């Protein structure tokens, strides 16, 4: 029997059949006609007609199934509700990033895509990404926020469990993807391949992608050219904290911690902080121990860093002022990078604190020095033993 003849038989039983059958997907498989119903009601309607009104030989030609609904992908968004666009403090250095994100939220995926925000540590990138996520979620969009490091770790876990398709489907089902700390994709080749395919899928579906990094895409060493090219394919926005914005943030944080400080303390905070994390850390310490407690702690930390520099200078027989200068001879350069490394490992100093102690404008040099020491330790056993020896000596003598 041909399909047209079969349909006429069904239509002869029910006057509404012509309209109802338009809702079905009809396939011919293994000598049978498969009618795929869009829902339970349609399936029951056709089964009733087939089983009640059609002859046995015709019934054998028909199979009725209900359309299988795709399982809804469960999304863990990792958003912190404390970050909002309303409490993001806007100034000259971050206004463009803020405005671009706000505009993108009005036209997800079609106006600026991707958005790549870059700037130093603690300039508000995470706050802005989280705030964008919370705003989009409030409007009913599906959102995921993740750091590149967390993305990599989750991917590895899913590979081990054999559930990598679940991981891919979760990321590919969102309306807004927020990836923070993009610099941590560096050197992770398998992670980059996975992210590249997720990025492409979302981009082709016109879903919004917002990325944040501590450096411009061109400076992302160890990240593939094709990913860098994708990052540069949208809009690049630098984010900075100028003095006026930092002053606003200090005032806001003081309100948050219910503190009133005299002008000279606020001036001290302005002069001795570069980012939001430092501001928050120092205000917390003032709340706990008072301004004098903060001064004592910072003096002690600075002294420890200088003791590390002096210790390394003595070992390498170079001058402290040479380590703190821009001298580039081999001996001084090695002493400098090891001193920076020990300041981080032995004293747990922040990158910015180390940069300040070594009279550097930002922490990029410090990151490079620490990475250089770690890479050389992997390649050179003698160097590894030397660094281990100096680390133990510094810890015993200074900390």
UniProtKB/Swiss-Prot annotation:
GO terms for biological process: DNA replication; DNA replication initiation; regulation of DNA replication. SsDNA binds at residues 156, 188, 190-191. Changing residue 188 to A: 4.5-fold decreased affinity for ssDNA, very poor unwinding of 15-mer dsDNA. Mg(2+) binds at residues 126, 181. Changing residue 188 to D: 8.2-fold decreased affinity for ssDNA, very poor unwinding of 15-mer dsDNA. Gene3D superfamilies: 1.10.1750.10, 1.10.8.60, P-loop containing nucleotide triphosphate hydrolases. It is found in: Cytoplasm. GO terms for molecular function: ATP binding; ATP hydrolysis activity; DNA replication origin binding; identical protein binding; lipid binding. GO terms for cellular component: cytoplasm; plasma membrane. Residues 64-77 are annotated as: Domain II. The keyword RNA-binding does not apply. Residues 78-290 are annotated as: Domain III, AAA+ region. Residues 1-64 are annotated as: Domain I, interacts with DnaA modulators. Keywords: ATP-binding, Cytoplasm, DNA replication, DNA-binding, Lipid-binding, Nucleotide-binding. SUPFAM superfamilies: P-loop containing nucleoside triphosphate hydrolases, TrpR-like. Plays an essential role in the initiation and regulation of chromosomal replication. ATP-DnaA binds to the origin of replication (oriC) to initiate formation of the DNA replication initiation complex once per cell cycle. Binds the DnaA box (a 9 base pair repeat at the origin) and separates the double-stranded (ds)DNA. Forms a right-handed helical filament on oriC DNA; dsDNA binds to the exterior of the filament while single-stranded (ss)DNA is stabiized in the filament's interior. In the presence of ATP analog AMP-PCP forms a linear, right-handed spiral filament with 4 subunits arranged head-to-tail, about 122 Angstroms wide and about 360 Angstroms long. Mg(2+)-AMP-PCP binds at the subunit interface with the gamma phosphate coordinated by adjacent subunits. dsDNA probably wraps on the outside of the filament. ssDNA binds to the center of the helical filament via the AAA+ domain, which stretches the DNA. HAMAP family: DnaA_bact (MF_00377). Domain I is involved in oligomerization and binding regulators, domain II is flexibile and of varying length in different bacteria, domain III forms the AAA+ region, while domain IV binds dsDNA. An ATP-specific conformational change within the AAA+ domain accommodates and stabilizes subunit-subunit interactions necessary to support oligomer formation. ADP-binding does not allow oligomerization. Probably binds dsDNA via flexible domain IV. This is Chromosomal replication initiator protein DnaA. It comes from Aquifex aeolicus (strain VF5). The gene is dnaA.
């Amino acid at each position: 029997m041909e399909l047209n003849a079969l349909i006429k038989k069904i239509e002869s039983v029910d006057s509404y059949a012509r309209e109802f059958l338009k809702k079905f997907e009809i396939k011919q498989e293994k000598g049978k006609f498969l009618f795929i119903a869009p829902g339970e009601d349609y399936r029951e309607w056709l089964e009733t007609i087939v089983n009640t009104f059609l002859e046995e030989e015709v019934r054998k030609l028909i199979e009725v199934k209900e359309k299988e609904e795709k399982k809804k992908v469960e999304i863990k968004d990792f958003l912190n509700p404390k970050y909002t666009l309303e409490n993001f403090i806007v100034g000259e250095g971050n206004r463009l990033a803020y405005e671009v994100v706000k505009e993108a939220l009005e036209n997800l995926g079609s106006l600026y895509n991707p958005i790549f925000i870059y700037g130093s540590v603690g300039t508000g990138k995470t706050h802005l990404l989280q705030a964008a996520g919370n705003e989009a979620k409030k409007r009913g969009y599906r959102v995921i926020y993740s750091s590149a490091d967390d993305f990599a770790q989750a991917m590895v876990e899913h590979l081990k469990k054999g559930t990598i398709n679940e991981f891919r489907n979760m990321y590919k089902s969102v309306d807004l993807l927020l990836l923070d700390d993009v610099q941590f994709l560096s050197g992770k080749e398998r992670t980059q391949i996975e992210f590249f395919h997720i990025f492409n899928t979302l981009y082709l579906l016109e879903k919004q992608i917002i990325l944040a990094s501590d450096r411009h895409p061109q400076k992302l060493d160890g990240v593939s050219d094709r990913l860098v090219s994708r990052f540069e394919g949208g809009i690049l926005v630098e984010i900075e904290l100028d003095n006026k914005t930092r002053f606003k943030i200090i005032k806001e944080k003081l309100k948050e911690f219910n503190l009133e400080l005299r002008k000279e303390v606020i001036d001290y905070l302005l002069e001795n902080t570069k980012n939001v994390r430092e501001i928050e850390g120092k205000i917390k310490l003032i709340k706990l121990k008072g301004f004098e407690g903060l001064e004592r702690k910072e003096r002690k930390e600075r002294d420890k860093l200088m003791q590390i520099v002096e210790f390394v200078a003595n070992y390498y027989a170079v001058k402290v002022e040479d380590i703190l200068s821009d001298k580039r001879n081999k001996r001084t350069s090695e002493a400098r990078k090891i001193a920076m490394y020990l300041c981080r490992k032995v004293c747990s100093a922040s990158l910015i604190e180390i940069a300040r102690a070594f009279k550097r404008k930002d922490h990029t040099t410090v990151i490079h020095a620490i990475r250089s020491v770690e890479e050389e330790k992997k390649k050179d056993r003698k160097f590894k033993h030397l660094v281990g020896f100096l680390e133990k000596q510094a810890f015993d003598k200074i900390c």
